[in-house]
Amino acid sequence: MRIPRSETMNSSFLKARGQQDVLSSPLERVPPASRPGKAPLGTPKTPVLEDFPQNDDEKERMQRRRSRVFDLQFSTDSIHLASPNRNIDVSTTISKFTNTQITEHYSTCIKLSSENKITTKNAFGLHLIDFMSEILKQKDAEPTNFKVAAGTLDASTKIYAVRVDAVHADVYRVLGGLGKDTPPQGEESHSGDGSTLETERTKKPAKPKKKQSCKTIEQNLSNINVSEADGKCAVDPMFQKTAASFDECSTTGVFLSTLHCQDYRSELLFPSDMQTLSSGEPLELPDLGFVDMTDLEASLQQCVEDRPLCPSLAGFQFTKWDSETHNESVSALVDKFKKNDQVFDINAEAEDDEEDVPDGPLVEDFVDNDEPDLSAAGDHEEFRSWKELCQVQSNQEEVISLEDRDIQVMCSFLSMKPGEYSYFSPRTMKMWAGPDHWRFRPRPKQDATSCTEHKKKSAKKDFEINFDDDIDFDAYFQKTKAATILTKSTLENQNWKATTLPTDFHYETDNLIQLHLKPGKRSLKMDQDQKAKTEHYEEIEDYDYNNPNDTSNYCPGLQAADSDYEEADDLFADPVGTLDLESDPKTTQENGHISPENQGVDITTYQELNLVAEPQKVNKIEIHYAKTAKKMDMKKLKQSMWSLLTKFSRKEADTEANHTESGQEGAPEEVADEKKLSGLTKDLQTRLPPLMAQNLSIPLAFACLLHLANEKNLKLEGTEDLSDVLVMQGD
């Protein structure tokens, strides 16, 4: 027998004694006084080891667990709510509770009952049933409160019901464990020398399980087959709408003209899948890397070595400079310029202009009028004004000082390769579009006095308010003719769309120069310096208008007789240049006289050159076709045709139709003799209503006859010349 330790024994003894004074353990079914070997509490004598029973470790563990659970559950409640105890001594417990503690315990029970928090864990710690007599004693002095009594009975009933459920569950838990076989435990035997012998466990061999044969053929087909609703995938509604509106007779595909691709993958997407702006991150483009230029290094070095840095100073020597050689080079350069045809002679006289120049300064030298002014067609000065030379005296020239302009700005207008008279870049001067766009206009003559009056600026008067004057307020507050409120159109225009900027989608501008199918390559942007280097307009020669391509393919642009274009005869006067209108055969015929040179000559001949005339316009021919679909009641058409085939009257045909609609089938009818389709069509014109008779055609009648042949077992045969169809009853 194992001897227990003294510390364990003493602790277990003290703990057992301390708990027994307050509340007994729920597993103790025997009263405390019936325990053998227990010393009374009042004994001053020190307990002897022989007086105590054997120590039970399992019981101590259970007591420690219950005390820990009790502390966790009732930490906020009164200290007198003890651990669950089903065999509690009511007389000893009630005597130790004061009236205040009983009142607190009563309020706690009522609160838990109202909140429905009475469970199996705290049901045995609530002593409302045990304190019922004490509560009634306290309430005897007061009149009976039925509301308090009802709440007390309700809480007591809940506590008792939960206790019964807990006992019932424990009993079934114990009964469930009775039928189970406990595993065999190894028995320990102590030998005389203290060695322990353990018996080996005998393991029974596991029996092989028999495989049960089951049917693999499913009898219910609904468990195997998938329903049609589950088999159909989700169809895009836009796809259904587009497919429904597809015309099978059209030459274009159903989706090729409407679907679009979004990115470089060229994947066709439906409109519902399209994204206006991509919300994802941009694709990372692969690095193009660097190009190896080591092979070109040797050839580039050879080009640099052979060329001088400054060709104009190639022969100049700092230490061996000679004035004679310098003068010779300068004289040679001067002779070169003198031999040039375009040498500017300062002492030369100015050439006189044959045309008259209007006196006085010019007003509105440039008028921003893009359209030609045809109202003053008779004024010769209007059409030769663009050829006039602007002669401005030296004293009227406006001199721009360098202080007002930056040298860097002025250099941007200069040409990269200036000539003797072309210092500015033609690209900059392209803003002048010529005489058709900008035209010089003569300035009207003004008197000297009027010029001086315009120069004088009117002095600006200071704003003053005189508070002494009498103000007529009626003039300011009288009802005016002008509207004082905003009109409806003004309010509609001044809406939030007119004053609010569009939504900024933060679109990447780099996508504009990015190729669609090859996003790795981009369009190069040329700087202004590179553009200026590539623009060598000075090296381009004048265009030769007399080249064979233009002279052979020239089209005079002949005008038709009903043309709206009319030109005044005085527009082509002598000052600008005489134009022979009689050279155009079309114009000579309109004027009423034909020159003998043009008689008998084709109108396409113009100055002994065979030219292609303007093609003739084809008259617009309107083709009549059916622009709207024909509507036909096929059911009524079939009834009328069947009545004609069976020689029924119209009234009998209607009665038969009513019988068939109500579900009563009449006697089957047959075709008596042969009928022709052409005759049936003519008879149908009189039987049908006017609108249906107008829409009736041979194809519709033949389609109706085919339906009847299928339903009524008719036989159709064609004539020998295939001009008509014979209808007869089938076998």
Curated annotation (Swiss-Prot):
Belongs to the CND2 (condensin subunit 2) family. Disulfide bonds: none annotated. The modification Phosphoserine is found at S12, S25, S67, S75, S78, S83, S91, S195, S227, S425, S489. The modification N6-acetyllysine is found at K627. Residues 204-213 have a biased composition (Basic residues). GO terms for biological process: cell division; female meiosis chromosome separation; female meiotic nuclear division; meiotic chromosome condensation; meiotic chromosome segregation; mitotic chromosome condensation; positive regulation of chromosome condensation; positive regulation of chromosome segregation. GO terms for molecular function: chromatin binding. Its main location: nucleus. It comes from the Eukaryota. Phosphorylated by CDK1. Its phosphorylation, as well as that of NCAPD2 and NCAPG subunits, activates the condensin complex and is required for chromosome condensation. It comes from Mus musculus (Mouse). Keywords: Acetylation, Cell cycle, Cell division, Chromosome, Cytoplasm, DNA condensation, Isopeptide bond, Mitosis, Nucleus, Phosphoprotein, Ubl conjugation. Regulatory subunit of the condensin complex, a complex required for conversion of interphase chromatin into mitotic-like condense chromosomes. The condensin complex probably introduces positive supercoils into relaxed DNA in the presence of type I topoisomerases and converts nicked DNA into positive knotted forms in the presence of type II topoisomerases. Early in neurogenesis, may play an essential role to ensure accurate mitotic chromosome condensation in neuron stem cells, ultimately affecting neuron pool and cortex size. Transmembrane segments: none annotated. It is found in: Nucleus; Cytoplasm; Chromosome. The modification Phosphothreonine is found at T43, T46, T182, T587. Residues 1-62, 178-214, 652-673 are annotated as: Disordered. Component of the condensin complex, which contains the SMC2 and SMC4 heterodimer, and three non SMC subunits that probably regulate the complex: NCAPH/BRRN1, NCAPD2/CAPD2 and NCAPG. There is a cross-link at K481 (Glycyl lysine isopeptide (Lys-Gly) (interchain with G-Cter in SUMO2)). One of its GO terms (cellular component) is condensed nuclear chromosome. This is Condensin complex subunit 2.
